[in-house]
Amino acid sequence: MKRPDADSRTPPGTRGRVLLTGATGFLGAHLLCALLEEPRLEVACLVRGRDRDGARARLDERLARLSPPVRPDMSRVQVLCGDLQDERLGLSAAAYDDTCGSIDAIYHCAGLVDWAAPYDRLERVNVGPLPALLRLARRGRRKRFHLVSSASVCYLTPGSARITEDAHDALKLDLLRLPYARSKWAAERLVLEACGAGLAAQIHRPSIIVGDSRSGQSNSSDIVTRMLAACVGMRLAPEVDLVLDYCPVDFVARAIAALSRDRHDGLRTFHLLNPAPARWSELVLWLNLYGYDIRLVPHARWLERLGQEVRAPRHPLRPLRRFFFERRDEVDGLTLFETYEEGRSSVPDDRASAHRLAELGLACPALDAPLIERCVGAMISGGRLPAPGIARARQLPVNGFDRLAFEPLLRSALGDASLRVGAVAPVAHASRDGLTSSLAAWKYGAGIGVHKYAMSVARRGRRTRRLRVIVKVKPLEHELRGAIVTAARVCSERLALAFATTPEVPGFSGSAQRELAVYALADARFARHAPRFYGTLPQRDSRPALVLEDLGDAALLGGRRGIDVWPSGHVAAAVRGIAQVHAVWYGREAELEREPWLGVSHTLRGMLGARELWRELAEFARPAFGAWAGVELAPLGESLVGALEAWWPEIESQPRTLIHNDFNPRNFAFRDTPAGPRLCAFDWELATLGLPQRDLAELLCFVLGPRRAGERAGRYLEMHRKALERASGRRIERGAWRAGFGLALRDLLLTRLPMYALMHRFRRQEFLPRVLATWQALYQWQAAE
């Protein structure tokens, strides 16, 4: 897709009049409002009706139902009573000629979205009007043509390619299985042919369009609404691997309106997808956290149950039976629904479109919990979903803290009673909330999560400066446990029961207060390798709200590069830095165990108390571990649980210290210093008493990769030992240190990696297969040594 030049935009207010079809539809009504945001632009809407008054009434009624309410300048809207199936669009000769001579562009938004209708019905509505509209576009003055198509034309089955915006020849009709997609393909072909004859046009391919990002108001008959209603009613959802790149309707409308002002010759195509998609299983989890009771079950079991229930005349999925049940020989007996699972079809590539939208300052709202909550809330208000059984707490607004909250805190932290805080503003950011905190936030609200703020700070004798901080609102322990139990129950009743009945889970119990205490440690070695801690803000419910230095995204190597194989200099900086932190409590185990904030640590007693939980986690993770790292790894977790009494005392016989216990690239950054990168570790809520090698083992699994992992690990293991010796002033025997690394690998496999497998069921952990393979390579290297 060629990018327009800087001066190739139509200046606002210079277009006179455009024609819009489909203005009474879900997207069309929003597109009308978006077009009217352009000053002085007039919009002629072609609307079906008995007469002009009837057509006008239909449009007025549709606009009146928009939420949030809008008040478009209707003096710039002309309603044309017409018919798209007529070769002259149902207009009189005079009205047709006037339209030909007065409009600058045509926006064809009308159409039928139906995932189960036969092609002949869809062709009549989605393809039939194109010849008449294209004749109108070519007649009289030069006009631009804008076709609202669908991203579904890019889903070719079988296929695995990413279809770029300009790859029209790659779209093969015989590989499009969905009749709706075939009808959109046919419409696009007509536009493509017209462009070959000199027409300037744009094709807009949105993904599935969901509710308004502000109100959640959605299309009552779309497939998403029907699917959610069915799963809530059945209390079952299919375990399928669907990527949900849905876009809110208001974003799609604004994007089309903005992109359509680009001036160009020929054809431009845009893919409108959500850059922050969710997965189907994550949506099901969110519904459970919202208060519904839905279990993920194998697709075949769900389909069998649906076959029984869909006989009811008013079942929400009854109109879509063909989509879910009809098996197609040409795709190995899959249903149309199954062809949309990840990996079975090609997918649209939106990188060029996303770049252009970013240049225009347009960002698609993430398909996150707040957006889903608004959409579900609107469905409940509209009677399309029942209210959930459990009421949720209302989230505090992100701007819930102001100058009066920050000023006394910063005065105390910086030791300056004269300090003044100016205007405080929340800062939008991509959330880095931990998975468990995200779950608690979804279930309980209460502002749980990471929020960023910017403020001006004036100090006597110094220049006023801008300060950016992070406010980390912590979930309470019962909230964290409740969220994890809910997630487990979606997948396995036995796993949920194990979480619910384990009185204290080592590492999780007391996590909120523990992180606060760790940040407050008065030790220069820790402070050098952690963000600055300013203190806590008071909360009405005694919920900790930690205020920390904002490191900025530039420092997050993991965020820039992804969690992948790293350069040796950064790995070494992480190893030496965490050794400094390990030195703080190294050799002081008894003293550390007396600290009230430590909670239940990883002792043999605590591990045995949670044995049933470890067993259920190992069993749950076994299929995934076997698929990713081989059958020999799959049963190892369960055997480690059975032999806890034999090998865990070996851990307790070695020197231990305070460890991060979640030490991977998602939880640390690097500061740039003249001496090179310096570690800055955050998110200390899982900190516990353990082997220092445990943090090293997790780090290496994430950053080495399986190839030559053992060879490289030996160097970093020795580097860690020597750094800890220097920092603690204690001699560490090399053989015992090496043996402790093997024990740490076992600990990692037992207590942490299965939790990632659980989260992977809902939010894809792309790193996990590689981490498992690296773990296995390290374990084999350690055993061979």
Annotated model-derived regions:
Residues L686-S728, D747-E766:
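Active-site activation/catalytic loop segments of kinase-like enzymes and analogous catalytic loops
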Residues L259-G333:
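Mid/C-terminal beta-alpha module of Rossmann-like enzyme folds, strongest
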Residues M1-K2, R17, R40, A44-V47, ...:
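Amphipathic terminal alpha-helices
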Residues M1-C109, Y119, V471:
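N-terminal Rossmann/SDR dinucleotide-binding element
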Residues V450, S456, G461-L608, P692-Q693:
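Conserved ATP-binding subdomain of kinase catalytic cores across diverse folds
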Residues A555-H660, R671-P674, R770, Q780-W781:
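ATP-dependent phospho-/nucleotidyl transfer catalytic cores
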Residues G101, A105-C109, A116-R124, G128-P179, ...:
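Conserved Rossmann-fold NAD(P)-dependent oxidoreductase catalytic core, especially the SDR/UDP-sugar
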Residues L173-R205:
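Active-site Tyr-X1-5-Lys
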